[in-house]
From Swiss-Prot:
It comes from the Bacteria. It comes from Cereibacter sphaeroides (strain ATCC 17023 / DSM 158 / JCM 6121 / CCUG 31486 / LMG 2827 / NBRC 12203 / NCIMB 8253 / ATH 2.4.1.). PANTHER family: AMINOBENZOATE/ANTHRANILATE SYNTHASE (PTHR11236), ISOCHORISMATE SYNTHASE MENF (PTHR11236:SF48). Chorismate binds at residues 311-312, 426, 446, 460-462. It catalyses: chorismate + L-glutamine = anthranilate + pyruvate + L-glutamate + H(+). Belongs to the anthranilate synthase component I family. This is Anthranilate synthase component 1. One of its GO terms (molecular function) is metal ion binding.
Length: 500
């Protein structure tokens, strides 16, 4: 446990502090951590990672008991600084929402110990696709049947970090000087939160029950008809032929009944579609569940990173077939041209916040393999410029070209025209602003929203001048299959009570 003496020194200097303790946890998994600590609570989250469809990331994180929650609705933001005790105690904030968020990020800074990863404290949640309207002048938004906040970020007062390499869990409790508490009182409260979590970790996970293999989900209902989506693709091609854009990414949203516990969907998804960015957020009135393959923007050690993905083939049944499919993908002129467009867009996005002369691709047109598919991937980095920060870096890449198009602003205007509803979470970013000033967000792809016993899945595809409308429609259907399959199998992971 962090000593009071070291805590007090920083506290008296006006610096936010953390209290943390470690526990051997070589028998625990990310799921058991969630089940023990937070699975029956609202305003909780879980983050984990699998690279290449098979290699688990070192750290998995569970967060809970936020001391504050920030939300954005259109041109207004609000905050609940009593979130642990009253979930409804939101107060409006004066000023532009992005400036209130920037101030909150600054308020939440902590100089973290070197033996803790950046993800151990900070602000966690999502910035939806429509947050770009606070930056770019875009036409009026479409109808919003889900009615969710455009962005939600929570600041957990307890974070548990599972280190899969060392087989231990670290429980972290931040303490904020803005609380006005004495050093002794602040330390005592943080230490109590740590000890409560450690006691929960000592107990066995709740008993589970198999609901059977029968799918307990309804039929998918789209906000497009089949012909309506193909007509949208044709309209997009008209804009391309007219020279307005090079590419645009229309999408469709499906809804289906889903009466199983939300965390069961996440557990099913992590099994059927392990991905580099896996997340479960329970915001009380709704949940966001995803397995995204793609970075939106990352800021680490003052280096900004984007990693465009475009170009896909299924995995082969044998190593020989896999190599043949890779060769086919890398010789497909349409796929290569689309990827090059997005690589150039990534350079431009990084260049908006990077020092002149530092933007460069570190990987170009490489193949990255996942459990079911392979993609063409490039990596672009740049050193962040003086005067820029984690929020400006994120906004420079929001939304990614892979969910909007190129040129980006005109493509978004066309998306507003083609799509019948506001996008919401889809196409935005999910991740965190770390307490040490770093940031990591993925694109909200392969992401589901659960609200009022309804599951919403959205997917799109890049339309270029020679796109086939039927093929584009089928691409969106195929991209939704991972979540559809996870929903069908979720009954295998449902528990008797308290799940989600």
């Amino acid at each position: 446990m962090t000593s009071f003496e070291s805590f007090e020194r920083g506290w008296k200097a006006g610096q936010n502090q953390i209290v943390y303790a470690r526990l051997t946890a070589d028998l625990d998994t990310p799921v058991s951590l969630m089940l023990k600590l937070a699975e029956a609570r609202t305003d909780t989250f879980m983050l984990e990672s699998v690279t290449g469809g098979e290699i688990r990331g070192r750290y998995s994180v569970v967060g809970m008991k936020p001391d504050l929650i920030w939300q954005c609705h259109g041109q207004d933001s609000r905050i609940n600084r009593e979130a642990r005790f009253d979930r409804q105690a939101f107060q409006p904030l004066e000023g532009h929402p992005l400036e209130t968020l920037r101030a909150l990020i600054a308020e939440s800074r902590i100089e973290m110990p070197a033996d803790l990863p950046p993800i151990a404290a900070g602000l966690f949640g999502y910035l939806g696709y429509d947050m770009i309207r606070l930056v770019e002048h875009l036409p009026g938004i479409n109808p919003d049947p889900l009615g969710l906040p455009d962005a939600v970020l929570m600041r957990p007062s307890v974070v548990a970090v599972l280190d899969g390499v060392k087989g231990e869990v670290t429980v972290v409790a931040p303490a904020w000087v803005s609380s006005g508490l004495s050093a002794r009182a602040a330390y005592a409260q943080a230490a109590e939160r740590v000890m409560d979590a450690l006691r929960d970790l000592d107990r066995a996970p709740p008993a589970q029950r198999d609901f059977g293999e029968v799918a307990q989900v309804g039929e998918m209902r789209s906000n497009f008809t089949h012909e309506g989506y193909k007509a949208a693709v044709e309209k997009a091609k008209d804009y391309i032929r007219a020279g307005d854009i090079f590419q645009v990414v229309p999408s469709q949203r499906w809804a289906q009944d889903f009466r199983l516990p939300p965390f069961a969907l996440y557990r099913s998804l992590r099994k059927t579609n392990p991905s580099p960015f896996m997340f479960f957020f329970n915001f009380g009135g709704f949940q966001v569940v995803g397995a995204s393959p793609e970075i939106l923007v990352r800021l680490r050690d003052r280096e900004v990173t984007v990693r465009p993905i475009a170009g896909t083939r299924k995995r082969g049944a044998t190593p020989e077939e896999d190599r043949a499919l890779e060769a086919d993908l890398l010789s497909d002129k349409k796929e290569l041209a689309e990827h090059l467009m997005l690589l150039d867009l990534g350079r431009n996005d990084v260049g908006r916040v990077a020092k002149i002369g530092t933007v460069r691709p570190t990987e170009k047109f490489i193949i990255e393999r996942y459990s079911h598919v392979m993609h063409i991937v490039s990596n672009v980095v740049g050193e962040i410029a003086e005067g820029e920060d984690a929020l400006s870096a994120l906004l420079a890449g929001l939304p990614a070209g892979t969910v909007s198009g190129a040129p980006k602003v005109r493509a978004m205007e066309i998306i507003d025209e083609l799509e019948p509803e506001k996008r919401g979470v889809y196409g935005g970013g999910v991740g965190y602003f770390a307490a040490n000033g770093e940031m990591d967000f993925c694109i909200a792809l392969r992401t589901a929203v659960l609200k009022d016993e309804t599951l919403y899945i959205q997917s799109g595809g890049g339309v270029v001048y020679d796109s086939d409308p039927e093929a584009e429609y089928q691409e969106t259907v195929n991209k939704a299959r991972a979540l559809r399959r996870a929903a069908e199998d979720a009954g295998l992971f449902a528990r008797r009570a308290g799940n989600g």
